């Protein structure tokens, strides 16, 4: 599963870059793919990375709405950019990628927070995604 871990990390980096630059994530994804084809130092972008980024792009408004609704005391704008994008990726994978077990989604998101964010971030990410996991059946019914 190391390949999936790497794919998630790269998807997070693409979301983060898009957020930081104020550019659509699909544009950033296309840039990454182009660079990986022209620069041998850049590893190729995996199918799973593409699936995560493209899936997120289709659900971005709903994902941001859910994060805003359940992140008690935080607005998206006030949230650290790293945490915001870990939560975006985790929310997409948790609610719309059925082949990934929920526990794996939460664990991977917490690991990203440990690697890229503050000491308080892993607990914040785990708490919010844990809440969405509890609500997953009703949230999915709303989507149908």
From Swiss-Prot:
GO MF term (any one): RNA binding
Annotated organism of origin: Streptomyces avermitilis (strain ATCC 31267 / DSM 46492 / JCM 5070 / NBRC 14893 / NCIMB 12804 / NRRL 8165 / MA-4680)
Family of the protein in this entry: Belongs to the NusB family.
Name of protein: Transcription antitermination protein NusB
GO cellular component entries: cytosol
Keywords on record: RNA-binding, Transcription, Transcription antitermination, Transcription regulation
Gene3D superfamilies in alphabetical order: NusB-like
Biological classification of the source: Bacteria, Bacillati, Actinomycetota, Actinomycetes, Kitasatosporales
InterPro entries named in the record: NusB-like_sf, NusB_fam, NusB_RsmB_TIM44
PANTHER family per record: ANTITERMINATION NUSB DOMAIN-CONTAINING PROTEIN (PTHR11078:SF3), N UTILIZATION SUBSTANCE PROTEIN B-RELATED (PTHR11078)
A single GO BP: transcription antitermination
Summary of the function given for this chain in its UniProt record: Involved in transcription antitermination. Required for transcription of ribosomal RNA (rRNA) genes. Binds specifically to the boxA antiterminator sequence of the ribosomal RNA (rrn) operons.
């Amino acid at each position: 599963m190391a390949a999936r871990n790497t794919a998630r990390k790269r998807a997070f980096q693409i979301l983060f870059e898009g957020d930081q630059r104020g550019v659509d994530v699909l544009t950033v994804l296309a840039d990454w793919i182009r660079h990986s084809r022209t620069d041998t130092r850049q590893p190729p972008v995996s199918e799973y990375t593409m699936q995560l980024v493209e899936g997120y792009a289709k659900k971005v408004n709903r994902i941001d709405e859910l994060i805003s609704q359940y992140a008690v005391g935080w607005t998206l704008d006030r949230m650290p950019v790293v945490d915001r994008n870990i939560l975006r990726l985790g929310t997409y994978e948790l609610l719309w990628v059925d082949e990934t077990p929920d526990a794996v989604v939460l664990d991977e998101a917490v690991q990203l927070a440990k690697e890229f964010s503050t000491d308080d971030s892993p607990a914040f990410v785990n708490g919010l995604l844990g809440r969405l996991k509890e609500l997953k059946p009703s949230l999915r019914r709303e989507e149908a």
